[in-house]
Amino acid sequence: MHLRIDTIEHTLTAAGLGPGPTGYLVAYALAEDNLRLGHSIVADSVNSLAITRQAWRDTAIRAGAVILEVELECSDVDEHRRRVEARTPDWPGQRLPAWAGVTGRVIEPWDRPPFRVDTAGRTTAECANLVVQRWPAAACWLPRHPAEHRT
């Protein structure tokens, strides 16, 4: 299941609720419900804050699921800028970040290393394939039951 924070936040805004933590809280609840049903979840978000990363981990732990934390990065600054500036809205009125907003965003440090994928020179399919190849290994580094988890 693909959970895209942009879509959830857009829907909440259209319903008269402004942006804020509500979109993430809805995503955590949907993720936990679906993880408990045995579904895999792809949580699509910027996830620049340590508190949101921990909330995703906690969601997986409560559901007894494994988690693979993935960070996408583009090491080619020119390519990254081209992608940001060429992006088109997915719905009318969608406000996309400008390059200055992307480069000015504060990314809090990770407290444990994610699986990093450098998207420079790669297609979306190639990047997705790298994640899929890594997924089976995730079960080796996160327990399936909350009682086994140590932070």
Regions found by a protein language model. Name each.
Residues 32-36, 60-65, 107-109:
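Conserved catalytic network of the ASCE P-loop NTPase/AAA+ motor domain
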Residues 61-84, 117:
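Conserved phosphate-donor/acceptor-positioning beta-strand/loop module used by diverse small-molecule
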Residues 1-39:
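Conserved substrate/cofactor phosphate-moiety recognition/catalytic segment
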Residues 13, 50-54:
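Short N-terminal helix/helix-N-cap motif within the alpha/beta-hydrolase-1
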Residues 7-9, 48, 73-79, 121-124:
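Conserved nucleotide-binding/hydrolysis micro-motifs of P-loop NTPases
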Residues 86-130, 136-151:
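Small-molecule kinase domains that catalyze NTP-dependent phosphoryl transfer to phosphate-bearing small molecules
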Residues 23, 52, 80, 123-127, ...:
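Hydrophobic alpha-helical packing elements
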Residues 41-45:
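Structural recognition of the conserved hydrophobic beta-strand(s) that form the central parallel beta-sheet
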